[in-house]
From Swiss-Prot:
Gene Ontology annotations of biological process type: lipid catabolic process
UniProt signal peptide: 1-24
Family, per entry: Belongs to the 'GDSL' lipolytic enzyme family.
Protein's UniProt keywords contain Hydrolase: yes
Protein name per its UniProtKB record: GDSL esterase/lipase At1g73610
Keywords from the named record: Glycoprotein, Hydrolase, Lipid degradation, Lipid metabolism, Secreted, Signal
EC number(s) from the headed UniProt entry: 3.1.1.-
SUPFAM superfamilies: SGNH hydrolase
GO molecular-function term, one example from the UniProt record: lipase activity
InterPro entries assigned: GDSL, GDSL_lipolytic_enzyme, Lipase_GDSL_AS, SGNH_hydro_sf, SGNH_plant_lipase-like
CDD domains the UniProt entry points to: SGNH_plant_lipase_like (cd01837)
Length: 344
């Protein structure tokens, strides 16, 4: 794998100019959970990086091309991202607003917001490399959110009910493995890959504990994507990078096993592991079954696709590292049902 090229392509997401477009929210109000809170990386980020001096920003065209009104909101894709689709599937609202959106409405606070930051990870080195919001700092944002929520709802009991009945969706590990370990090699002298995966799982547990101590009780923890099959990873050979996929699969296996055993550590909490690797790999292996025609190329934003493809719904990936809205919509229904079954 040409790691330097992959990293440069990831850095190509950067734009320093600041741009904001508000996004109207539709509330549903038929959910068995109170709210959705998203933490982690660009798979879930709905615009928290827009005002950062970061290489990981996408608040510019053609991002958001297929979003409502064709607006670039800071989501890493052509339209809605995974956190939006999960929020809708849980019956909350069809868009999950970014907490750092300066125009965030108070009435959105009770049904959930997004704290995730594109380019972030569990490892502090990952966030420093990309200029994103480290997961520990996302927890600090959540603390500030609780203070704001208390002021909006007017009483502690109601605020506690929102916090304890919400689903906490976590996506982390993608950038730690793809960037910090394989691309920059920042941790390769310190850790073997199995040891680094162990450390990432430990950091995941620390993140869960921080949220648990603030009242969180329902956790949906996502594994990584098949990182070796991202267009950025297969740009030279067009084949999936087996070793990178093996590293991601190893982390996912360790994470899943740990999640299964956390109930004894966190009394009263519920957990579900969200498999992203195998559903997306299924689209890559058998794209025609879901109406896709291209799995190796990105629709947009690569040297070979400076002009975006005409129909992103025919592509599994929007850019070098992120699935299209259609891909998320294709794999989400089973995941949503699993979350409902395990966290109700």
């Amino acid at each position: 794998m040409n790691c330097l090229m992959f990293f440069k392509m990831l850095l190509a997401f950067s734009f320093i100019s600041l741009f904001y477009v508000g996004n109207a929210q539709q509330s549903y109000g038929n959910s068995t959970v109170s709210a959705l809170f998203a933490f982690g990386d660009s798979i879930l980020d709905t615009g928290n990086n827009n005002l950062l001096l970061s290489v990981s920003k996408v608040n510019f065209y053609p991002y958001g091309r297929d979003f409502i009104g064709g607006r670039a909101t800071g989501r890493f894709g052509n339209g809605r991202v995974f956190s939006d689709i999960i929020a809708e599937g849980l019956g909350l609202k069809n868009l999950l607003p970014a907490y750092r959106d300066p125009y965030l409405w108070n009435n959105d606070l009770t049904t959930g917001v997004c704290f995730a930051s594109g380019g972030s990870g569990l490892d502090p080195i990952t966030a420093r490399t990309t200029g994103s919001i480290w997961v520990s700092d996302q927890v600090t944002d959540f603390q500030n959110y609780i203070t704001r929520l208390n002021g909006v709802v007017g009483n502690q009991e109601q605020a506690n009910a929102v916090i304890s009945n919400a689903v906490y969706l976590i996506s982390a590990g993608n950038n730690d493995i793809a960037i910090t370990y394989f691309t920059t090699g920042a941790r390769r002298l310190q850790y073997t890959l199995p040891a680094y995966n162990d450390q990432l799982v430990s950091w995941t547990r620390d993140l869960i504990k921080s949220l648990y101590d603030m009242g969180a009780r329902k956790f949906a923890v996502m594994g990584t994507l098949p990182l070796g099959c991202l267009p950025g990873a297969r740009a030279l050979t067009r084949a999936c990078e087996l070793f990178v996929n093996q590293g991601a699969a190893m982390f996912n296996q360790q994470l899943s096993a740990d999640i299964d055993n956390l109930g004894a550590t966190f009394p009263g909490a519920k957990f579900v592991y969200v498999d992203m690797y195998n559903p997306l790999l299924g689209l890559i292996i058998n794209p025609q079954a879901s109406g896709f025609i291209d799995v190796a190329d990105a629709c947009c934003c690569t040297p070979t696709h400076l002009i975006p493809c005409l129909d992103a719904s025919r592509y599994v990936f929007w850019d070098v590292a992120h699935p299209t809205q259609k891909s998320y919509e294709t794999i989400a229904p089973q995941i949503i049902e699993n979350i409902k079954a395990k966290l109700a």
